[in-house]
């Protein structure tokens, strides 16, 4: 996300001794990993471990809201979507004591990302982590019967975290679409009247992990899958299991992650330039 200081900030899953990692860039190409803990305190509902997939938006009042996946104390290892607020993009972020979504009976809620619509309304997209209660195999959902892993859309108040009404489903995995055991990591942008929903299919440990997109003319859908592998393994010099994309609100830049090398021990962050035209997205 681009902050009020004109710099770009990226936020990453726990690692390097931090719950939430933060990197900064002046130009979106060269990044510096900061030695800070963006989420130094926790809410009462979450454990100390496994903080995943943070996303940050800037509110109209200049404050920053972080969405993240935290492990539920009441039903570990399943996760809830937590929210936290800070005065600066680097934090410290202070968590709210009530999670935005849990749905623990369906496997939990993860991979939240914020979105500001053209009329000023705020939304959050996230994944119901159904594969966490699957029956084994690839990402615990490769053995029949396969479990649903829907992407939901939640409208929120201007504060970025108070729900308005119920969440609605806008996408789900479909074996006939080649999605594998799941769809996950939603990222929503609007371009020239078309909503682009970026997401990943398959498991991040699978060479088939990728970035795809679906489009709609209404924020609530229906979303039509392009079934285009926008980024896939082997692309651009040999990417390995790339996915988990975040597209900036301007719609022309994208971050995603993939294995750093063939040892498959660490994930690295990658950047790409993006072009949106009509209902088509392409890497440029």
PLM features: what roles do these ranges have?
Residues 1-284:
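Carbohydrate-active catalytic/glycan-binding domains of CAZyme proteins
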